[in-house]
Amino acid sequence: MIHPTAIIDPSAQIGENVKIGPWTHIGAHVKIGDYCEIASHVVVKGPSVIGERNKIYQFSTIGDDTPDLKYQGEPTGLVIANNNVIREGVTIHRGTVQDRGETYIGSNNLLMAYVHIGHDCIVGDHTILINNASLAGHVSLGDWSILSGYVLVHQYVHIGPHCFIGPSAIILHDVPAFVTAYGSPAEPRTINREGLKRREFSAEQIVLANRAYKLLYRRGLPLKEAVKEIAALGDDEVITMLLTSIRNSTRGIIR
């Protein structure tokens, strides 16, 4: 059902069984997939592609121009996959031509009230961003990671999969896979043991992850030496995840 007060641009493509509430504005070059629910007073601008079964709550602004001063009105994009919940007052900006030209959000994510996703961000699957968490431009957030309320993430930071970031933390450097971080600026605390349990990693894998963490953070080793010793632990998934996130770091990891 589309409310009669909703304003929908003629170029917008609306899928089947989509609900659009009163006073919502769907702009030009927007594609909305089947079974989406968009509440009242939402603004969706394009070019944007929104997949299936996404639920967007009131007063959110999706796909607006980036405030990046380099942006000159280029037709950059936003892609949101499937089964996401986007709560009240969330803002998500499109990309810039200086980067990928696209902001991307995966599937099965929960963005709580007043979350901000900046231009050119890449958000994986199954993440949770709690109220007022903010990603600056060009940030990458790995699958299954959780950002607590009021977390601020500096531009270009990469946060690996299965991370947990504590309340009001300020993230200035990359966070390796399954690491928990707290503070301002954030510092590593331990492995995300509870998160790994919930994702059904075995007890042996969690022990292995903890051994790798201690090599990285508790032995006082130079990073290259720590990476070498972690690699010697084998090729289990947790080791591969950790090494990949360290080797892909562009800003240096938190230490």
Sequence positions of predicted segments:
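Structural signal for interior beta-strand "rungs" in well-ordered beta-sheet cores
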Residues: 1-187
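Terminal amphipathic alpha-helical/low-complexity segments used for targeting or macromolecular assembly
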Residues: 1-5, 10-11, 16-17, 53, ...
